[in-house]
Amino acid sequence: MGVHPIIRRRGRTAIAACCVALVALVSPAIAGTRTSSSYHLTTHLGLKKVRDSAGPQQIRILHLSPGKNVPDIAPATQQYPMWALTSSMSARAGAIAGINGDFGTSRGQPKHTLMIDGELWTTGQSGGDAVAWSANGKTAYIGHPSLKILAKDRDRTDAFFVQGWNRGAPNGGSIQGYTTRGGTVTQPPGKVNPQATDPHFCAARLTPTAPVGWNGKARTSIVRQYKVEAQPSPCPKTPLGFNGENDAVVVAAEAATPAAGKITGLRVGDKIRLSFTFKGWRNVTDVMGASEMLVKKGNNIAPGYNPGDNYILNYNPRTAVGITKGCSDVDTTTKCRLIFITIDGRQGSTGWSKGVRLPNLAKQLIRAGAYRAVNLDGGGSTSMWSKKRNPTFCESTPSVGGCLVQRPSQSNGERATRSAIVVMPSGDAGTPRGLR
């Protein structure tokens, strides 16, 4: 009897050892095998191609260390509505790589905040988060953009905030700003042929008198000087146009609101200073709006999916951008890297790539080194383009040249979007001199 426990113990030990061996053999198949290849597109830009058999998933990662190569934003067109392919926007900009940008509306507007080379295009149609960077790309931020637009009448020591920019008609007592970027979609309020029931709007047209620049060494606000060129009185029902001035700004408020007094208080010839301030984001010249935060201070904060949730939280192709801790800390010895990632999806049945939910996307970004990260447009919009062609990483070759390094989910290829984040080969020539 005394011997049997020892024998049984050995048996258990042997069985346990056998089980461990089996787990060691089986676990990779359960967890998925991950294979990767890395390529140098330039000295500062690398491409990593990853296949994870769990899913399966096809992942593409661009690592940018800003230096000679810098990030920039390429718009689909110069005015709304905006529609173009990521490959076309990237190639037209003279970029060496690019990914699709923010979500958009059915009317061809960016959905969230968009600033390009120091010019605010829109405050967006809804809230959201954003990625932002300096002209040289060595400072970057990700989070919720806290933007203040202040108009100061330097002749009358009066000031007012502008609540929206190329967003829509004034409502709720707000003052809205408009530029020619709004195109045929977002225009100054009013009706060309108004009816008796249409509201009156008070508006003023401002034209620039000086180049754009910073508010000083702190570089916390982008500023520009204007003069009041027109301020119709009494406030009409018809819109105030730009009078052929591409750089003109129209500010407007509904006549029946207290905000109208700020507009009617302006006089033709008054000197106005407009300032654009992203709180806590100094030195920023480019801002790309986005949706959900994925990574914050190195932690995965992506929203999960539960049955009945919006399909956007389920398995989908994905595009996202992340930054390292060195992009926005005060330690000058830490370096900034930007991380652009795409994960193909809706192609699981072919064995190519299933797509991921947002927590898995965040996991991949953290693995790639992201300290903060945010979700961009995905689904059929997900695209990553490279100017350099290499048969080992190219998946298709668009007519504009270069290649797509991933496979769009739509059978007809890329889907048109509103903008792209691109990597420029030698600085950002589009940034005005006063903001460099």
Model-derived segments and spans:
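Secretory targeting and sorting signals
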Residues: G2-A31
